[in-house]
Amino acid sequence: MDVIYNAIDVSKHQGKINWEAVKNAGVTHAMLRAGYGRYKNQVDPQFERNSAECERLGIQYGVYWYSYASTPAEARQEARCCLAAIQGKHLCLPVAYDIEYEPCILRLRPADGL
């Protein structure tokens, strides 16, 4: 059985989202950028609001962490920052690790396990 969700992917780049309008448009799921990088102050500025609005309106959500890691140690630090950012959240969808920054990808080796 195929399951299709009407979902969106959001971050600070979408600005202050009108989540009621999003829900009224039929969106049932969202992936929220929780943050990026390996410092705790790199939580997405809209993450708290976006997650609170999803919870308030019953929109199921998961999160992603945008990675700049180029070593396993950096990736572990990013994972710790992500876990700190999502503590206490009520995620219904997975935590995803977003690796698309080309300079970091080019430094990765298969042996790194990333």
Residue ranges and their predicted role:
Residues 2-114:
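Substrate-binding cleft of extracellular glycoside hydrolase catalytic domains
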